[in-house]
Amino acid sequence: MLGGLPDLRLGLHALALVAIVQLLLGRWRWTTACAAAALVCVALRGPLAQAGADAVYRHKHRIAGAQVLWSVDSPYQRVEVVRAPGRGMMLYLDGLRDLDARDLDALNHYLARVPARLMRPAQALLLGNGTLSLVPELAALSGSLLTVEIDRAVVDAGVRFFTPAAPLAALTNWSLIEADGKAFLAASARRFDLIVVDLPSPLTLGEAYLHTREFYALCRSRLRPGGVLAV
C-alpha cells in the first residue's frame, strides 16, 4: 500500500523467518545476519515500491513526472491515485484510467447538474461514483440521495483526493451503501425519480456485467413514472 499506513505484513514475515532460523539452527550469528537482512528489506520496501509504481506510469502510460500518491489492492481491484504536472489528479482502476480531475466539472454537469435541475427529484439514486464527486451537486438538487458503491477503497481515495470529507459530512439528505449496484437493484423494491449511473467502462469482466440489457432493465424497473436514467 502506498500513501497510507505502512503494510506491516512484510515486517511480520521477516520476524517469523528470523524466529524459524533461530529455532532450526540455534546459532545467534546466523540469526543476527538474517535479522539484519530482514531489516534492510523492510526499510527498502517502501522506497522501491514507490519508485516502481511511479516508473509504471511514467514509462508504460507515458505520463511525464507521474507520481503515485495512493495504491491499494481492494478485494475487487487495484485502486491508484496518480498526480502529474499540468494534469492534476487521476484515478486508475487496475491500471486503466477511470477519472481525470480535469474532467470533473463536465462529468458533474451532464450526469448530475442537467438532469437534477430539470427534474428536482424527490428520490435520487447514484450507482457507482466511488470518488463521490457527484454527491454534493446531486444532494443539493434532490430531496434525498442514495449512493451505492461496492468498493470502499475507491470511496477512501475519493474522500482523500477528489471530494473533501467535510462537505459530505454536512449533508443530511445523503446516505451511502457499500454494495454491488446490480444486486442492490435486484433486491430492493425502492423506486426513484432519478437514477444516475457512473460506472467504469466495460473493459474488464468485472464491469462488463453492469453494461447489459438486464442491468438497464433493472434500472428501468426501479424508476417511478416519468423517472429518468442518466448515463
Label for each model-derived stretch:
Residues 1-231:
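Alpha-helical transmembrane segments of multi-pass membrane proteins
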